Amino acid sequence: MSLSNKMIFLVVDDSKISRKWLIEMIPKKIVENAEIIEGSNGEEAIALYDQHKPDVVFLDITMPVIDGFEALERIRAINPEALVVMISADRQKSTKEKVLSLGASAIISKPVDEQEFRTTLLKLVF
């Protein structure tokens, strides 16, 4: 992926503040040439993924309607190569193992460290 192509990011979290904060952490040189789509639950994540086919998805685990685990599975059913970064306040090893076994590209713990977030994003898109 190159910065000359318009990238699409899907940011899904039931907290509007968390979504805003995640969006603000995307490096400016990337965000200037990107479309950012927001969702507030797993059901929206699946529909928005199917409609927009984003380059990278940031997906919270604990959300209403459909949780992040199920949303991840359904997104991976649409596109097995989807780049999905799971975001979770749950720091248990079993949670990390579960999301990676479901096909997540990475998992980042809340509170999200800005440097970890940016490093993870840059590894995925370059």
Question: Locations of the language-model features?
Answer:
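Two-component/phosphorelay signaling modules centered on CheY-like receiver
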Residues: 16-37
